[in-house]
Amino acid sequence: MKVDYTNVYTFFIPENQKDKEILENLSKNVVIRKLEYNPILKRKEIKYVTLLQKNRNNTYYILSGLLPYLKMKYPKIHTSLIDIEKLKNDSIWQTLRDYQKRAILNLLEQPRGIIDAIMGSGKTYMIMAICKAIKENVPILIIIPKYQALLEQTVKKFLEFFKKYEIGWNYGKGYKNGRIMISSSTCLEKLSLNYYKAVLTDECQSVPANTIKKALLKCKNAAIRYGFSGTPIGRSDQNDYITIGLLGNIIEKVTYQELKEKGFTSPVKYFILKYNSTDFYDKDLFLYSDTKEWHKVVEKFILENKTRTKIILELLKHIINSNRNCLIVVERKEHGKKLEKEIKENFNENIVKYISSDTKHNFRAIQEFNSGKFKILIATQLIELGMDIPNLNTIIIASIGKSSIQLLQRIGRGLRPQEGKLLLVFDFQDGDNNVLYHHSYQRKKWLMQKGFSYEEVILYRDIEKEIERLWFEKCQNQMINY
């Protein structure tokens, strides 16, 4: 049997009947679950698909990153592109922490792989160090999620360690050529993707998205393929296999517990606020779970929920009086706008700002928040993807959902360590709808799995007094200890 290793797919060409039988047997043994929409039944159904596909020419093929599932290793064809000594002699090596050096060296032994590193571990520095280890004649593509503010933040850091002519960027209307091309995921089609011999993907949990997936499939000359994320997998079976297939397996992990023990992350006090709304109860809506009409649940129990909004406003009163800042994470623009209006009416106009993925000048707004120009930042999913907010010390998760990726990305925005800093996180256990309640349960499960502890607080009676008691007995006392 012939095996043709390529940077995207590995092909298996049977030369006789025995080879065909071996490959057919392999194909049956590497099967995964996949959700597919059934237009007749109008719902998603579980189907089983094989990782080892067959084309019309009876040639079998698999994404090269999935070779370990066939008990095979991808050849180390990247070694001629790597110079470890060059990295160790560079000034950036001295700035790296011990766990960063360990992760980088282990990753560089392989032509492809992922570093699973919790938020606040310095993934951008690891990416820069790997670029230093790659020889100077090798063109590198760095893929950044779609938000311009995140790309600008990355470019700014790179220019501290690389010469200006080395660094290029590609986003929106902005373009500059360079050996190290930092590109927004939405602008990849503008590039000649075959040109790059190394591809590094930040926030690689986004790889299954069509724009990034198609781009990585077109990077046929990229012998080096690395991914970085605090939550690289955990979407679904099918999407996880796409990520691994295009970038390789997780090679190294940097956990919250490791950073906490070494003092490289902020301590976290996580509260889950258990409540039931006092202004309405609808048995039909409690049992409601039709995803097509899901907006009704969101509007009733999130957007129009006066009790939930009151809890947020009471928390903000103590947060502001304690001279702390706060990030409020929302899922929908209308929720963010509504909270912004409520906060301005209850406090003052200049204390809060709302930003979303389509808000102009997001980077400037985040810098102003970080410098203390205003105290409360309300943001949508933009804030989940690597935005650097080192001074953030309080988070209110006003959104819903059960995704481990989203939850950990949100917490991660406040994990940047500072002397005397304690990160307070407030989450909700919504008891008015069974699906929302299930979402809360899933979030608690993910917290425990990732090494975070939490405390449940019941808010069933006098909201104002109970929030006051929570703040002075559980929050302020903890802050004094730090």
What are these regions (language model features)?
Residues 110-132:
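Walker A/P-loop
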Residues 124-126, 133-160, 332-334:
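Conserved Walker A/P-loop ATP-binding site and its immediately adjacent core
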Residues 148-173, 346:
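Conserved helix-turn-beta segment of the N-terminal RecA-like "Helicase ATP-binding" lobe
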Residues 168-170, 174-176, 327, 337-338, ...:
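Conserved helicase ATPase core of P-loop NTP-dependent helicases/translocases
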Residues 196-197, 378, 385-400, 423-427:
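A short beta-strand element within the Helicase C-terminal
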Residues 205-270, 447:
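Post-DEXD/H (motif II) to motif III coupling segment of the RecA-like Helicase ATP-binding lobe
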Residues 290-331, 338-342:
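Conserved interdomain hinge at the start of the Helicase C-terminal
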Residues 413-444:
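Conserved segment of the helicase C-terminal RecA-like domain
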